[in-house]
Each structure stands twice: as structure tokens, then as C-alpha cells.
Amino acid sequence: LQTGQAKGYTEAQIMGQLQPIVIDTHPIGNPWLNYSVYLNNTVLPGVIQLMVFLVTVFSIGTEIKYSTSRKWLDMGGNSIAVSLLGKLLPQTAIFTVVGFMYCAVLYGINSFPLNSGWFPMLLAMFLLIISSQAVGVFMIGVLPTPRLGLSFASLFGMISFSIVGFSFPVQGMDPTLQALTRLFPLRHYFLIYVDQALNGRALFYTLGEYAWLLGFLILPFLIGRNLKRALLDFKYLP
């Protein structure tokens, strides 16, 4: 610019040579190119999912660690389902309040894009929480010690941030990894967010992602017998 001005060119003439074509970008759903819209709507739900994993695994694992699992089962009538519901429902309520407050801050106070209204995203947040709890129960059922269970939860939760399509598009991944993304609740929440909050598509087109989140609720039933056996017979070794 200074060289051109020294040669007697006007600023308009110089800019025409430096940047002959000006890109006028208006992305759908985020016309301001606000990075906070992208970052907060992806990272914060991932943090919530990770915390649900850890709290679920820890709360069940401590029963095994401190040898209180038999008493816990007795309080639930020796039913693993009743015992899990009694332990996890208060956590569900707390995490749901936190998740809804997160939505209120982002979409209400900060006016982030919410093109399909509140209901689709609040429902997605609730399903993310209960599906993450179901995955957490599965984790501690597979590895019924606090140490290994928490390691599993931490690893799975941290991998979520990179494998579900936040930092690298899923379409560019190996086909095997593309299939594995379906195993993470956060992936389905992210797709719901893109369709409902950003693009404002009809709810019909996102029903499959809601169904996937509900499908994770099957996991505790698959591991329930093994978890109950661990609660009754497993001896914790420091």
C-alpha cells in the first residue's frame, strides 16, 4: 500500500490490484461468522456429557469401592433397575437444570441462532443427559472398578470432542471411523443442533437422531446382570 501511494496511485486503485475480488460471505445460520456460536454450541455440551459420564461411573463405583453395594441393592429391593433409578434420577434432575440453564444463556441471553424454537434443543439436551447416563452405567458394568471405569469414561468423553465432527468433518474420516461416530451421544446432539438451531429444518428430518439418543437407554439392560453380579461379589483391590 505504501509503495503504491509513493508511486502516485490512489488507495482505490491500489486495493483493486491487491484484492480484485471481495468475498461477501453470509453463511446460513451464522451470518456474522461468530466463532462463539460454533464453539460454545459444541464444546459445552461435550463438557456436560463428560461430566455425566464421570459422575455416573463414580457414584456407582464408590459403592463397590467402599463395600456398600449390597446395602444399596437391599434398599432397592434387590432390583438393579430400582437401585439405579433411585441413584441416577436426582443426578438427572440436577444435570437437566444445568443443561437448560446452558440453553437459556446461549439462546436467550446471548441470542444465538435458534431457528426451530426452544423445544427441539431442550429435548435434545435432556436426551443427551439420560443417554450419557446410560452409557456411564454400561461403562461401570463392563469395568466394575472406579479406577478403570473412570479411565474408560474419561477416554470415551475426550475422544468425543474430535470424533463427532467438531474439529474435522466426519465425511473426511475413514469409513470405519465414520461408523464409530454413531456410538457417541454427542454426535447425535450435534446433528440435532445443526438441523434445528442453525438450519431450522422440520423436526421430521431429525427424528432419527432423537431415536439414536433414545437407543442408548438399552445399554443398562444389556449389562445389568453383569453389574449386579459385580455389586454382590466383586472384591475391590486398591
Spans of model-derived segments:
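Homeobox/homeodomain signature
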Residues: 8-13, 18, 79, 104, ...
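Membrane-spanning alpha-helical segments of multipass transporters and channels
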Residues: 93, 101-105, 112-238
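Juxtamembrane loop-helix boundary motifs flanking transmembrane segments in multi-pass membrane proteins
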Residues: 15, 24, 28-32, 72-85, ...
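Transport-system extracytoplasmic interface segments
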Residues: 1-55, 227
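Hydrophobic alpha-helical transmembrane segments of multi-pass membrane transport proteins
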Residues: 29-106
